[in-house]
């Protein structure tokens, strides 16, 4: 195994048929009839989601902005980076989408944006096609009162970057995109 070498470009899987079995504004579930790499037939369920976006928003005091909310699927409260989804209908670029999400969730804008991911990263590649981009956002300024979705009950706080990184390494921040963002930002800031 060599992660620096190109992987095969031809899929060993064969899709026989595909049908949408569920859709809402946030996800689509697709069921594919497939032939696996070993030649066995079967079905494969795929959750389709838009490109996810996240930002390590760092202020002049080296505090990171975190957003807290109850995560219904996990049944627990979660502290996370400002995150959202790219909306091709509303956002010209993924960065425009992240700027929108940062303002909506936190009431902040950033003057300095650095892309932390060299390409989209897969978030759970055995069940979903969801990928994500992450940025380091600095030179934060207030824009307005946050105007998040009416279904969201968000709390926004700032904590020292090192404390947030320690929380991620200890599992107290366990959102995958947030953990990755903090690790990548730590490396970028060295």
Q: What are these regions, as identified by a protein language model?
A:
Residues 2-5, 10, 44-47, 54-100, ...:
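Conserved Nudix-box catalytic region and its N-terminal flanking loop in Nudix hydrolases
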Residues 13-54, 60-61:
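Acidic, metal-coordinating catalytic segment for phosphate/diphosphate chemistry
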Residues 28, 50-51, 58-59, 71-73, ...:
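Active-site segment of metal-dependent pyrophosphate-handling enzymes
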